[in-house]
């Protein structure tokens, strides 16, 4: 039978069984190696309250702690929420991650490769 993906959509190679995790969107049980995982990193304090907190703080330089939340989706919810996209047959073979979109302070897109060339 034909195979759609080289890894069968999993990261299990050689293991017989992996534990299940729950999708954060629909609570579906998904094998841990198949779930689409993303980290959400943000400040514990919302942006509006950061200045108030720094003014009230005794310390001059206080690093506000961050919250690290691991988001785990099932395949259908990840596609629906556009965390991952459906790719063509040729596109599925590309294993390198897509280039990250970066913005400068003005809100304009920045190409890191072009900046590296101009810096030299």
From Swiss-Prot:
- Please give the Pfam families that the UniProt record associates with this protein: Ribosomal_S26e
In Swiss-Prot or TrEMBL terms, this protein is called: Small ribosomal subunit protein eS26A
Q: What else is known?
A: There are 2 genes for eS26 in S.pombe.
A single GO CC term for this protein reads: cytosol
Q: What does this protein do?
A: Component of the ribosome, a large ribonucleoprotein complex responsible for the synthesis of proteins in the cell. The small ribosomal subunit (SSU) binds messenger RNAs (mRNAs) and translates the encoded message by selecting cognate aminoacyl-transfer RNA (tRNA) molecules. The large subunit (LSU) contains the ribosomal catalytic site termed the peptidyl transferase center (PTC), which catalyzes the formation of peptide bonds, thereby polymerizing the amino acids delivered by tRNAs into a polypeptide chain.
Family, similarity comment: Belongs to the eukaryotic ribosomal protein eS26 family.
The record's GO molecular-function terms, alphabetically, read: mRNA binding; structural constituent of ribosome
What assembly does the database describe for this protein?
A: Component of the small ribosomal subunit (SSU). Mature yeast ribosomes consist of a small (40S) and a large (60S) subunit. The 40S small subunit contains 1 molecule of ribosomal RNA (18S rRNA) and at least 33 different proteins. The large 60S subunit contains 3 rRNA molecules (25S, 5.8S and 5S rRNA) and at least 46 different proteins. eS26 interacts with eS1 forming part of the mRNA exit tunnel. eS26 interacts with TSR2.
Which intervals of the chain are annotated as region Disordered?
Answer: 88-108
Localization, UniProt = Cytoplasm
Question: A GO BP term, please?
Answer: ribosome biogenesis
* Gene3D superfamilies in the cross-refs: Ribosomal protein S26e (3.30.1740.20)
Q: Which UniProt keywords apply?
A: Cytoplasm, Ribonucleoprotein, Ribosomal protein
Question: Where does the signal peptide begin and end?
Answer: none
Q: Where is this protein primarily located? A: cytoplasm
Species of origin reads Schizosaccharomyces pombe (strain 972 / ATCC 24843)
List the InterPro entries: Ribosomal_eS26 (IPR000892), Ribosomal_eS26_CS (IPR047864), Ribosomal_eS26_sf (IPR038551)
């Amino acid at each position: 039978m034909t195979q759609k993906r080289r890894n069968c959509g999993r990261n299990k190679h050689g293991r017989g069984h992996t534990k299940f995790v729950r999708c954060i969107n629909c609570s579906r049980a998904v094998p841990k190696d198949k779930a689409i995982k993303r980290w959400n990193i943000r400040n514990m304090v919302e942006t509006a309250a950061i200045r108030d907190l720094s003014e009230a703080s005794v310390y001059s330089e206080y690093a506000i702690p961050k919250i690290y939340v691991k988001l785990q989706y099932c395949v259908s919810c990840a596609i629906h929420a556009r965390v991952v996209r459906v790719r063509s047959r040729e596109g599925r073979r590309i294993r390198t991650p897509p280039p990250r979109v970066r913005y400068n302070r003005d809100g304009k897109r920045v190409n890191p490769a072009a900046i590296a060339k101009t810096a030299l």
